[in-house]
Curated annotation (Swiss-Prot):
Family listed: Belongs to the radical SAM superfamily. RlmN family.
UniProt-recorded name of the protein: Probable dual-specificity RNA methyltransferase RlmN
Domain Radical SAM core: 94-314
Stored Gene3D superfamilies: 1.10.150.530, Aldolase class I (3.20.20.70)
Gene: rlmN
Residue sites binding S-adenosyl-L-methionine per the record: 153-154, 185, 206-208, 282
Organism: Porphyromonas gingivalis (strain ATCC BAA-308 / W83)
Single Gene Ontology MF annotation: rRNA binding
Localization: Cytoplasm
Length: 341
């Protein structure tokens, strides 16, 4: 697929086909700036070369197959990504902002207790083209102001393709977005150091408990990617510039919502310039956890602020269409596809 290729790769494509070197830049402009969906649109490339391109290459653009709309304006898109596989993307409009939450894997290996995506298992990484197609193909593509890699999957378990997609989004030959418009979420997976070194996008870390043993029960990935090691890596990086790091903390009733947890959270984050986002737990099937109530979340927030941290309670969006944090799953769509085939 041409979508997801770098300028260098597109130039190589052009040269292999006997086209002039500058045709690589033409291809990049048509793919990333003009967002062409068909080679026939590329009118400054000869008809003969357009035909050859179409015979050899897939442009990588395809439409969504379903969309659901929430009462709060949130929209959830379903995208096919190969035979019988799907991913979901979520559009979150808010005032003059439009944030798209995109997926990086089909399912997820991390198997977090509170997340529906992990319950469906892992069925492959997305290519850079499949990641970018989500951005290009939603109805609101031209209105997007921010991107968050917080959909299905662990982005830094698919570091190569995630970084390729970010390159196409932020380089001048691509979409030319500021990295400040993009946030990548992780539990602290193996690609963290490379992400910090090779991109300038914001980082969000899924934390959820300051106590490693408790976190391991909620997030089995703690065994392979200990939070304390993740925090050491983050401390070693200079976040004094415009790049930000935030920590996501789902607040569970009677589990991690007391002042002991708040104080320990403050202790382990000491010295890291960061924001803490408190998130309500959204009920999913076969999981007995419950969300903490507003009063306890507010008390937790104030305690974190007393320790000198910026702490906010994040608004829930799209819960009625299973588009809120931890609720994305394409198991039903994939099951329906299998039955119809």
């Amino acid at each position: 697929m041409l979508l997801g290729m770098s300028l260098e790769e597109l130039t190589t494509v052009a040269l292999r086909m006997g086209m002039p070197r500058f045709a690589g830049k033409q291809l990049a402009e048509w793919i990333y700036v003009r967002r062409a969906t068909d080679f026939a649109e590329m009118t400054n490339i000869s008809q003969a070369n357009r035909q050859k391109l179409a015979e050899i290459y897939d442009l990588g653009r395809y439409p969504w197959s379903d969309v659901q709309c929430s009462v709060d304006g949130t929209k959830k898109y379903l995208f096919p990504v190969g035979e019988g596989r799907f991913v979901e993307s979520v559009l979150i409009p808010e005032g003059d902002r439009a944030t798209l939450c995109i997926s990086s894997q089909v399912g997820c290996k991390m198997d977090c207790l509170f997340c529906m995506t992990g319950k469906q298992g892992w069925n492959g990484n997305l290519s850079a083209a499949e990641i970018l197609n989500q951005i290009f193909s939603v109805d609101e593509a031209a209105e997007l102001t921010n991107l968050v890699y917080m959909g299905m999957g662990e982005p830094l378990d698919n570091t190569d393709e995630v970084l390729r997609s970010i390159e196409a989004l932020t380089e001048p030959w691509g979409m030319g977005w500021s990295p400040k418009r993009i946030t990548v979420s992780t539990i602290g997976a193996k690609g963290l150091e490379r992400f910090l070194a090779e991109s300038r996008c914001h980082l969000a870390v899924s934390l959820h408990s300051p106590f490693p043993e408790e976190r391991r029960k909620l997030m089995p990935g703690e065994k392979a990617f200990p939070i304390m090691q993740t925090l050491d890596r983050i401390r070693a990086y200079d976040f004094s510039g415009q790049r930000r790091v935030s920590f996501e903390y789902i607040v569970f009733d009677g589990l991690n919502d007391d002042m002991r947890h708040a104080d320990e959270l403050a202790a382990i984050l000491r010295g890291i310039p960061c924001r803490i986002n408190l998130i309500r737990f959204h009920k999913i099937p076969a999981v007995s956890l419950r969300s903490s109530d507003t009063a306890r979340m507010e008390a937790f927030r104030k305690r974190m602020e007393s320790h000198g941290f910026t702490c906010t309670i994040r608004a829930s969006r799209g819960e009625d269409i299973f588009a809120a944090c931890g609720m994305l799953s394409t198991s039903k769509a994939e099951s329906s596809e299998e039955k119809s085939s």
